Amino acid sequence: MSDLKMQRSGGEPLDTIKAYIALTKPRVIELLLVATIPTMLQAERGENNIVLILLTVFGGWMGAAAANTFNMVADSDIDQRMGRTRARPLVRHTVSNRDASIFAWVLTVASFLWLWLLCDSMLAGIFVLITIFFYIFVYTKWLKRRTHMNIVWGGAAGCMPVLVGWAVIVDQFEPGVPQQWWQAIVLFMVIFFWTPPHTWALAMKYREDYKAAGVPMLPVVRTPVQVTAQIVWYSVATVLTTFLLIPATGWIYAAIAVISGVTFLFMAIKLHLGIKNGGKVKPLKLFILSNNYLAVLFVALSVDAVLGLETIGEMLGWTTTFF
């Protein structure tokens, strides 16, 4: 009746609850909030259906929590070999793999039904199912352990909240109202291009962890100069993509997109030049900045949409339904 048995049983009820919460990776789910709410506000620009937004966020949260839990089950073998993941519930046996899998399946079904029945959008529910399938089978089980481009293509799963949010809003539109899916695609691509520099900056700090676990992240298989060069290129792509949305937004988003974008690029280039010139650099600074950059950008989009400001496209006389 050792401590190990108590550990495997999950200990006190509060500890078990904390373990299940940890399975969902709450910090990762922050991206869901950052992406979904501004996207929905932009889609309905000026309407601000708060109840529908909150319902969608909760439904999306269940889907993201399911994906993250499945991910922990699939990665439990390598998590025990990485210093920063050894305290995860499945490694410490506070939750069994079987119970975690059941938890993930319940969340998956609940998320789909929630979005379909309560948010009146089967399309949003289907997007969540696609996200979970892609994240587990394409990224976790296939790409992650086989290619240094894992996060580039696998990161597409993290972009899906914008499509979920947009789908819920446009499914409420009357027939004939332009759905303007191009805006959702732009926001999808912003997160798609943002994910690699964000992740690689963190992976540079934990390079030895990934190496020990046999995960071929770019910093493991390429030199720091090569890694930071890729970070710069993807940062450029991110910033340029944010500009594509300017015609459909007001001056607040436009100004923040330019100012924050220049700052993000400056820090990415500074990191690259610092390493290239043999200086002492801290990649984690770029990781933190990238988080703040995306948050500020989407907050600006939210404020712009809530205020219902005249769009740049309207200011320029572009009166087509495209904008």
UniProtKB/Swiss-Prot annotation:
One of the record's GO molecular function terms: protoheme IX farnesyltransferase activity
Stretches that traverse the bilayer: 50-70, 97-117, 118-138, 150-170, 184-204, 231-248, 252-274, 293-313
Enzyme Commission code(s) on record: 2.5.1.141
GO cellular component, one term: plasma membrane
Location relative to the cell: Cell membrane
Pfam annotation, one family: UbiA
Main localization, broad class: membrane
HAMAP family hit by this protein: CyoE_CtaB
Family as reported in the entry's similarity comment: Belongs to the UbiA prenyltransferase family. Protoheme IX farnesyltransferase subfamily.
Protein name: Protoheme IX farnesyltransferase
Source species: Corynebacterium glutamicum (strain ATCC 13032 / DSM 20300 / JCM 1318 / BCRC 11384 / CCUG 27702 / LMG 3730 / NBRC 12168 / NCIMB 10025 / NRRL B-2784 / 534)
Record gene name: ctaB
